[in-house]
Amino acid sequence: MARLKEKIQTDVNAAMMQRFGYKNVMQIPRLEKVVVNMGLGEAIQNPKGLDAAVGDLTRITGQKPVITTAKKSIAGFKLREGMKIGCKVTLRGDKMYDFVDKLVNLSLPRVRDFRGVSPKSFDGRGNYTLGLKEQLIFPEIEYDKIDRLRGMDVTFVTTAKTDEEARELLRLIGMPFRAE
C-alpha cells in the first residue's frame, strides 16, 4: 500500500473527523483524482515538442498521457480545430498517492526560492490547482536530456464540499501552504 494512503487512513481521517465533526466516516473528504496537464503553445509550430512533453509526463507520472486537441479555431494564434496542443494524465488510486507523496516531499522543496504554495488557488468546490514552472523539480527528469523548460498544472480533485475542508485535507496530507 502507498505510504501516503496509510497516513491518510490512520492520521488524516481521524484529524478531519475531529476538526469538522463528521458523524460518518464516509463524510470525510478524500482525494478523488489528480490531473497533470501540460499545455504546449509551441506545438503549433513544432509538433516534435509534443513528443518530448509526452515523454517527460510519462516519466514524471508513470502513466502514458493522452494528447489534447484544440476545441476551437483561433486565427490570432494560428490555431485550427483539432490541432494537437498539449497532453494530460489523470491519476487515481495508488499511482495518485505515490505522485502526491513525491510532489509534496521531494519535488516542491526543490523549487527555487520556495516559500510554500498559494492557499488562494481553490475553485470554490473543494478542488485545488497548482502551477509548476519547470519539469526539472521532479527527480525522474535529467537536466541533460531536456530540450526546453515546460511548465504544467496539477489539479487535486477532492470530494470536499467547501474550500476550507479541502485546504485542511491537503494541509494534513503535507501540502506546504504559504502563510498569508
Swiss-Prot record:
Keywords: Ribonucleoprotein, Ribosomal protein, RNA-binding, rRNA-binding, tRNA-binding
A GO molecular function held by the record: tRNA binding
Pfam families referenced in this protein's UniProt entry, alphabetically: Ribosomal_L5, Ribosomal_L5_C
Domain of life: Bacteria
Entry GO terms, CC: ribonucleoprotein complex; ribosome
GO BP: any one term: translation
Cystine connections: none
SUPFAM superfamilies hit by this protein: RL5-like (SSF55282)
Family per similarity comment: Belongs to the universal ribosomal protein uL5 family.
Record note on quaternary structure: Part of the 50S ribosomal subunit; part of the 5S rRNA/L5/L18/L25 subcomplex. Contacts the 5S rRNA and the P site tRNA. Forms a bridge to the 30S subunit in the 70S ribosome.
HAMAP family per the UniProt record, alphabetical: Ribosomal_uL5_B
UniProt function note: This is one of the proteins that bind and probably mediate the attachment of the 5S RNA into the large ribosomal subunit, where it forms part of the central protuberance. In the 70S ribosome it contacts protein S13 of the 30S subunit (bridge B1b), connecting the 2 subunits; this bridge is implicated in subunit movement. Contacts the P site tRNA; the 5S rRNA and some of its associated proteins might help stabilize positioning of ribosome-bound tRNAs.
Record's protein name: Large ribosomal subunit protein uL5
Organism, as annotated: Heliobacterium modesticaldum (strain ATCC 51547 / Ice1)
Upper classification of the organism: Bacteria, Bacillati, Bacillota, Clostridia, Eubacteriales
Gene: rplE
